[in-house]
Amino acid sequence: MPKKFIFVGPESSGKTTLCKLLSEKYNTLWVQEYCRVAAEEKLQNPNIDANAINFNFTLDDFINMAHRQNKEEYELSKKCDKILICDNDTFALTIWCERYLHKYYSEIYDIYKNADYLNNDNKIYILTKPNVPFVQDGYRDGEHIRDWMFDRFIAEFTKYNMKYYIIDSPNYIERLQHAIDIIELNIQ
């Protein structure tokens, strides 16, 4: 089972960019954020106003996303030897669910916690601070709550006594180097 490096954080804080660059550097696979995929699929629906950026997610949507995220992580982890890079995971989805539904739902955390087959103890979380410019890509709508989300991640990591690192440089090159340093420290 590979060591898993999970990049989490608010919107437009560089997670996906880091995941892509690190998967190339380490010649490994990376798990995409399924919540993002689901949002893109919702906006493809002709009954949704794509200009409104209102996804109208439900708890059932998040439960389905959690199972899909776990499945993707599991399938890709079977194809990696040493390292798997993840753009969010089901633990992170608990906070995204709270962000969109305005309430914490333990059902999502339970899906994360009960996924023994994912070997969650083998994960290193890397939280990206939202101190880089917000980039609107047509799907994002949370610029005003990036600090809140960052604080929620810290609170949840603390609550569950989880190991995590923070990438806080506003410089993208330094952020990448910090991520590499974290990975190197944890794969030796």
What do the predicted segments below correspond to?
Residues 2-4, 81:
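Pre-Walker A (Motif I) flank of P-loop NTPase domains
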Residues 7:
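Hydrophobic anchor at the beta1->P-loop junction of P-loop NTPases
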Residues 11:
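The conserved Walker
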Residues 15:
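Conserved lysine of the Walker
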Residues 20, 24-68:
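Conserved substrate/cofactor phosphate-moiety recognition/catalytic segment
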Residues 61-119:
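Glycine-rich phosphate-binding loop used to anchor ATP phosphates in small-molecule kinases
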Residues 101-176:
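A glycine- and Lys/Arg-enriched "phosphate-lid" helix/loop adjacent to the NTP-binding pocket
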